[in-house]
Every structure is written in C-alpha cells, then in structure tokens.
Amino acid sequence: MIMLVFEGQEIETDAQGYLKNSSDWEEAIALLLAKQEEITLTEPHWEVIRFIREFYKEFNTSPAIRMLVKAIAQKYGEEKGNSRYLYRLFPKGPAKQATKIAGLPKPVKCI
C-alpha cells in the first residue's frame, strides 16, 4: 500500500501516485501532486483540473485524451480544446497528469 502524506495524514495512492479515493482530494492536495509532477499550477491548469473533476462527477469516468480535447473544445473553444495547448500545460500527457492532479483514477485508455 502506497501513501501520500498530507498535513500529517496518510492518503492512499496506487503505485503510480493516483489517489485511491477521489473524495480525499482537495485543492491543497492538487498543489502537492502537481509539485511531484514538476508542474506549477496556473489558472489555465486549474480550469482543466476543475473541468476534469466535473466530467468525472457527471460520467463516473476520467476522460481519455481524445475525449478530453473534444470536451474542452466544446466548453472553452478551439484555442484551448486542442492537444498542443493541453500538452503545454501537462507535458507528460494531459489526460494522465491532469487526472492525477485532480485526484481521480487513471483514465482507462492511459498507458
């Protein structure tokens, strides 16, 4: 069992650092997870993270990259809803990193 220590509490994660229980997440934990991913969160990052959390609440699944790009484009327009923009924010993979920082399970189609 792997744990993330946050404010003196142990929070269970999987071997890749994804939270086991998404209800353990809060924005302060996102900052810690982002630091582990070597990402400094800016408002555009938060926009994607919050969007992914809402997507998860609605569909009970984390979006794979293709679905994420399409959904972001529908909500925020083509300027933000494209792979290049999302990879600039999350260089190791928008679906993978943003989902992890958002405290959600790893997307099924993520390797």
Swiss-Prot record:
**EC number assigned by the record:** 2.8.1.-
Cite a single GO MF annotation: sulfur carrier activity
Q: Which InterPro entries match?
A: DsrC-like_C, DsrC-like_dom_sf, DsrC-like_N, DsrC/TusE
- The superkingdom listed in its UniProt entry is Bacteria
GO biological process assignments: tRNA wobble position uridine thiolation
Q: Which UniProt keywords apply?
A: Cytoplasm, Transferase, tRNA processing
Pfam families tied to this protein: DsrC (PF04358)
Give a yes or no for keyword Cytoplasm in this entry.
Answer: yes
Q: Which family does it belong to?
A: Belongs to the DsrC/TusE family.
Q: What NCBIfam families does its record include? A: dsrC_tusE_dsvC, PRK11508.1
Q: Its quaternary structure?
A: Interacts with the TusBCD complex. Interacts with MnmA.
| Function of the protein | Part of a sulfur-relay system required for 2-thiolation of 5-methylaminomethyl-2-thiouridine (mnm(5)s(2)U) at tRNA wobble positions. Could accept sulfur from TusD.
Please report the name of this protein according to its UniProt entry: Sulfurtransferase TusE
List the lineage, top down: Bacteria, Pseudomonadati, Pseudomonadota, Gammaproteobacteria, Enterobacterales
Write the gene name.
tusE
